[in-house]
Amino acid sequence: LRMPAPGAQPQPDDEYDILTFTDSTPDRLLDQMARLRERMSTDIPLGGMNVEPEVWDTERIRAMEAKVAAAGRTILTAAGINRASGEAVAYTTLETATDGSAFAFQSDTLVRREDRGHRLGLRIKQANLDQLAREFPQVERVHTWNAEENSWMLHINDQLGFEATSRLARWQRQFRD
């Protein structure tokens, strides 16, 4: 796993702390993480796609965590925490197999709209990659995907050393009533 140059490291922010955890979401963050996961379905650039908002609650998070563990995988999460409120305002997740796999998959990254502009996306992704390197040093590649219109996340991925290797198109058809 090639990590970014030291100059690419984001600087700390006085307003936010970064918390990392593996597999199980801390109980105190469950409701907050459910709200963030709901916003993941509506607050990201969707390229004109129409999607239904997802419903997340603490039970769904725990069920998802159990399903991932049962499949022999682990979830690494980094969350941005507002120091003043103690509230989770951003998160990112990585998944990898627990069997020594050399691959990991970057999944969600979300910063609440009202907390953007503090480099939280970069900070949480970097913290999670650091966590991955510590806990799973055998991982050599991280696969991620991104919408072309999400220029902010594409820029973050560039800063972190990701390289485009393929393209995927999504099509949606609207049926008339």
Give the residues covered by each predicted segment.
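Acyl-donor-binding surface of acyltransferase catalytic domains
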Residues: L1-R28, L168-R173
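Conserved beta-strand-loop-alpha-helix junction that forms the acyl-donor binding cleft
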Residues: R112-R116, V142-L154, Q172
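Conserved active-site alpha-helix within GNAT-family acetyltransferase domains
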Residues: L122-R123, Q138, N146-S166
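Conserved acetyl-CoA-binding loop-helix of GNAT-fold acetyltransferases
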Residues: V111, G117-Q131, Q159
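Hydrophobic alpha-helical core bundles mediating ligand binding, dimerization, or RNAP-core interactions
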Residues: L30, A34-R37, M64-E65, K125
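Actinobacteria-biased recognition of intrinsically disordered, low-complexity terminal regions
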Residues: E87, Q174-D177
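Conserved GNAT acetyl-CoA-binding A-motif
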Residues: F103, L132-W145
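A conserved beta-strand-loop-helix scaffold within acyl/acetyltransferase catalytic domains
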Residues: S41-F103, S107-R113
